[in-house]
C-alpha cells in the first residue's frame, strides 16, 4: 500500500526559532518517525526572494542554518527527503500553468497574504512575486502529490487556495492528475502561532523577540528573564494576571503532561498573589532547557561538517527533482503540451 505523502518547509530568512519548533518542526519529526508517511521537507528560498529580492545573501547564508536546525530537531535524510526549492526548476514551470487558473481578485482576497502585506509595509509597491506566492505554494505541494501539509493555523487559506487550483486544473483538463491536499494543524492551540517574548503577536528575528534553536543557554536565560508578564504585577504579594502573560502562555505550550499539576498550581498561586515573576521565569527556563539542550548539542555536532550538510541537501534535491519532473510530464500531457511524444 502506498504511503500518504507529506510536504512541508520553511523560508530560509534566518535561523529557526522555538515558534517554528512547536508550530511545525516537532510535528514533522513525529510524522517522520511513525514510518507511515513519505515526507518531503524543503527550504523555500524562491519564496523568500519575494520579499528579499535585493538581499539574496541573507537567504544564501540561511540555507545552512535552517538545514542545521532541521537535522538538530531530528529530521533524518535517511527517512525524509530534504531539498532546496530553487534547485527544482519544474516548480516554476508548474506555477506558470497554475497562474492562468487563478484570478488576481482571488489572490488579493487571500487573508494570509493580506495580513502579510500589511505587516511588511509594502504599501502600493507589492512585488508581483509576493502576491502570487500562494500559486507557487500550490506548485510545491502538487509537484509531489502531497496528501497532507503540516502548517500553522494561519496558513489554512493557503491550503484552501491550493485545493481550488487542483479542482480547477483537473476540471479544465478533464483529468485526475493533481491531488487535493489536506492541512495538518497543531493540536495545541497555544502552539499554533507562538507570540514573541514581548507579547507581540509574531515571533521573528527582525523584532528581536524570539528564542532561536541555535541560542546558547546563557542567551536563552537572558531572553526568558526579560519576557513580558503582567505589567501591573509590581509586588510579589499582589495578585497577577495570567492572561496575556507570556511566561504562562509558554508554559502551556512547552509543559508536558507530567508538568500540568505544577503549572496549574503556579497559575492559582500567581492569581492569588505571593508568587513572583522571577520564580515563574526560572521554572519556564528549566522547561525550555529540557527541550532545547539536546537540540543545541546535536546542532553543534552537525555544524562541524557543513560539507556533509550541503551534500545531504544536494542528494535530497536530486531525488525531489525526479519526482517533480514526473508530475510536470503528467501536467503537460493533460494540457496537450507533450508535442514530441
UniProtKB/Swiss-Prot annotation:
Transcription regulation as UniProt keyword: no
Known EC number: 6.1.1.2
Top-rank EC class of the record's enzyme: ligase
Key words, A-Z: Aminoacyl-tRNA synthetase, ATP-binding, Cytoplasm, Ligase, Nucleotide-binding, Protein biosynthesis
Predominant location: cytoplasm
Span(s) of short sequence motif 'KMSKS' region: 202-206
Pfam short name (any one): tRNA-synt_1b
A Gene Ontology molecular function term of the record: ATP binding
One Gene Ontology cellular component: cytosol
One BP annotation, GO: tryptophanyl-tRNA aminoacylation
Residues annotated as binding ATP: 11-13, 19-20, 152-154, 194, 202-206
Motif 'HIGH' region boundaries: 12-20
Keyword Protein biosynthesis attached: yes
Catalyzed reactions per annotation: tRNA(Trp) + L-tryptophan + ATP = L-tryptophyl-tRNA(Trp) + AMP + diphosphate + H(+)
InterPro entries documented for this protein: aa-tRNA-synth_I_CS, aa-tRNA-synth_Ic, Rossmann-like_a/b/a_fold, Trp-tRNA-ligase, Trp-tRNA-ligase_bac-type, Trp-tRNA_synthetase
Subcellular location: Cytoplasm
Function statement: Catalyzes the attachment of tryptophan to tRNA(Trp).
NCBIfam families according to UniProt: trpS
Record family assignment: Belongs to the class-I aminoacyl-tRNA synthetase family.
Oligomer and partners: Homodimer.
Official protein name in the record: Tryptophan--tRNA ligase
Amino acid at each position: 500500500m502506498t504511503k500518504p505523502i507529506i510536504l512541508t518547509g520553511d523560508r530560509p530568512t534566518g535561523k529557526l526559532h522555538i515558534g517554528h519548533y512547536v508550530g511545525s518542526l516537532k510535528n514533522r519529526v513525529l510524522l517522520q518517525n511513525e514510518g507511515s508517511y513519505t515526507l518531503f521537507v524543503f527550504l523555500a528560498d524562491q519564496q523568500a526572494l519575494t520579499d528579499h529580492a535585493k538581499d539574496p545573501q541573507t537567504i544564501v547564508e540561511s540555507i545552512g542554518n535552517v538545514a542545521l536546525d532541521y537535522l538538530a530537531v531530528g529530521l533524518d535524510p535517511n527517512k525524509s527527503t530534504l531539498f532546496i526549492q530553487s534547485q527544482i526548476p519544474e516548480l516554476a514551470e508548474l506555477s506558470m500553468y497554475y497562474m492562468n487558473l487563478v484570478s488576481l481578485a482571488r489572490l488579493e482576497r487571500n487573508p494570509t497574504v493580506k495580513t502579510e502585506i500589511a505587516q511588511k509595509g509594502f504599501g502600493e509597491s507589492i512585488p508581483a512575486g509576493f502576491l502570487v506566492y500562494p500559486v507557487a505554494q500550490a506548485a510545491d505541494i502538487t509537484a509531489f502529490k502531497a496528501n497532507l501539509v503540516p502548517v500553522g493555523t494561519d496558513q489554512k487559506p493557503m491550503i484552501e487556495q491550493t485545493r481550488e487550483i487542483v479542482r480547477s486544473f483537473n476540471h479544465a483538463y478533464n483529468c485526475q492528475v493533481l491531488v487535493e491536499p489536506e492541512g495538518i494543524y497543531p493540536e495545541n492551540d497555544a502552539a499554533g502561532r507562538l507570540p514573541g517574548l514581548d507579547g507581540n503577536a509574531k515571533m521573528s528575528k527582525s523584532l528581536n523577540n524570539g528564542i532561536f534553536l541555535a541560542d546558547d543557554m546563557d542567551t536563552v536565560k537572558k531572553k526568558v528573564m526579560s519576557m513580558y508578564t503582567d505589567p501591573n504585577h509590581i509586588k510579589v504579594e499582589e495578585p497577577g494576571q495570567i492572561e496575556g502573560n507570556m511566561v504562562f502562555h509558554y508554559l502551556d505550550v512547552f509543559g508536558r503532561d507530567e508538568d500540568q499539576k505544577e503549572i496549574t498550581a503556579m497559575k492559582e498561586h500567581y492569581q492569588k498573589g505571593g508568587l513572583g515573576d522571577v520564580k515563574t521565569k526560572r521554572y519556564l527556563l528549566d522547561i525550555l532547557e529540557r527541550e532545547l539542550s539536546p537540540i543545541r548539542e546535536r546542532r553543534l555536532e552537525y555544524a562541524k561538517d557543513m560539507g556533509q550538510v550541503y551534500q545531504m541537501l544536494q542528494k535530497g534535491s536530486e531525488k525531489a527533482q525526479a519526482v517533480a519532473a514526473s508530475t510536470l510530464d503528467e501536467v503537460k500531457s493533460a494540457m496537450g503540451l507533450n508535442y514530441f511524444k
